[in-house]
Amino acid sequence: MRFPTPLVPARLLRRYKRFLSDAVLEDGTEITAHCPNPGAMLGLKDDGARIWLLPNDDPKKKLKYGWRLVELPDGHFAGIDAGLPNALVKEALAEGQIEALRGYSSIRPEQKYGDENSRIDFLLSEPGRPDAFVEVKNCHLRRESDWAEFPDCVTDRGAKHLRELTKIARSGGRAVMLYVVQRTDCARFRLAPDLDPAYARAFDAARDAGVEVLCHGTDITPEGITLTGPLPVDPSPQARD
């Protein structure tokens, strides 16, 4: 998936109020950019970080830049747009790029389901096969070695989604939790139970019930982001209590 216009480099001054960030362009101009990520963004919002912005000339938009990438000190990239993984997965599903989810002719996004007023990211259907309920989560936390971790803060909504998937699996349906790692310096995946113990417990219960856990990496450059192959998921229980 290519960015619609070329990204421009900048230096981050600060990120604040969850969805705002101040940065300085290479010509010295200070601007305010939209930050499309409500999470903690641990390790990705350090003052002075080199970032990449998507400019726009839409007269309806007050902010003329959107923050998209962080260029890490070692040259790797991290994507910070929390909504992008759904678009990447939608594209990959349509092209049959996710081996574990091939063979479904109907791909319906944002379908209502469950007992807790939820919407599944993708409902996959094919005559003669059980429907597949696929939930997608964005992951860009790395703290140790080449481990990608989720979540980077408490996510009650994420735990709710795991509960809904657990119910589907227990009733004999196909339930899939798909994590998309928006970092190029990670090679495997696990949870961060110290940051959200409740999510880790819900994850263990979901996996024990038969929820399939998938993880895919991404290739990230200032030109675009694409979904890559599967990453191994830590098979051990994730909760610490």
Swiss-Prot record:
It holds the Pfam family SfsA. InterPro entries: SfsA, SfsA_C, SfsA_N. This is Sugar fermentation stimulation protein homolog. Belongs to the SfsA family. One of its GO terms (molecular function) is DNA binding. Transmembrane segments: none annotated.
